[in-house]
Regions:
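Accessory alpha-helical/coil subdomains and C-terminal extensions
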Residues: 62-135
């Protein structure tokens, strides 16, 4: 079991009692930990994939992540990670395409070698730019956070704008999943946020009959519609 999210120590102990090997470090990206554990079995393209993952997880400044980033030109790695992120997010309900991306990366291809990735990233960027105006118009603020219901895009794509444009230390974006009777909730915290949002969201979501959690400044939840 390899993870970098906040886990209750009793869960780790229970896994170890079951003879599960646990690799768990909240200070490094999960993919970086996978690479570090199995690098002797991986090809020389693997550190590039791990570097992109660290950037996407805002963890390229950590000890292992920063060492990997030094291998590559920083701007090359940043644009590659960004393009891959937009392609993954834009196809998140298309497992065949996601599998195709995995296979292309496994064949040691860079994002610019994979057909149409930059064009698709441009489409995603255009969609995000449209969200900015909608957030400015539709978000609401409380004393310590900004929040907004998202109607026509993903909550995770809008939540950083909600936090930033509200001027608050926490942003919350939520979108109804009509087919499932739930709300998907994304939460982000600024660098000034002093509380561990992942733990708070885990407690709140589970107490409301949902589930959730994550990092101190980036997390998410699923909440039953009547409890939103």
């Amino acid at each position: 079991y390899i993870d970098h999210h906040d886990i209750d120590p009793t869960v780790v102990t229970a896994l170890q009692k079951l003879k599960v090997k646990v690799i768990h470090d909240i200070n490094e990206c999960t993919t970086v930990q996978v690479y570090n554990a199995y690098k002797s079995k991986l090809n020389d393209h693997a550190p590039f994939v791990a570097t992109c993952a660290a950037i996407t997880d805002y963890m390229e400044d950590r000890p292992l992540g920063s060492k990997l980033l030094q291998i590559y030109d920083r701007q090359f790695a940043l644009i590659s990670a960004t393009v891959m992120t937009y392609n993954i997010v834009g196809h998140q309900r298309e497992p065949d395409y996601l599998q195709y991306l995995v296979e292309e990366l496994s064949d040691s291809k860079f994002p610019h070698d994979i057909p149409n990735t930059f064009e698709f990233a441009q489409i995603q960027v255009e969609k995000l730019s449209q969200i900015i105006a909608k957030v400015k118009k539709g978000m609401k603020t409380m004393s310590n956070l900004g929040h907004m219901e998202i109607l026509d895009s993903g909550a995770s794509g809008a939540v950083n704008f909600v936090m930033g444009l509200s001027g608050k230390d926490v942003g919350v974006a939520y979108k109804e999943r009509v087919d499932h009777g739930i709300y998907a909730v994304s939460v982000r915290g600024s660098k000034n946020c002093k509380v561990h949002l992942g733990r708070i969201v885990n407690f709140l979501a589970t107490s409301l009959g949902g589930s959730g959690g994550g990092h101190d400044k980036a997390c998410g939840a699923v909440v039953p519609k009547p409890k939103i």
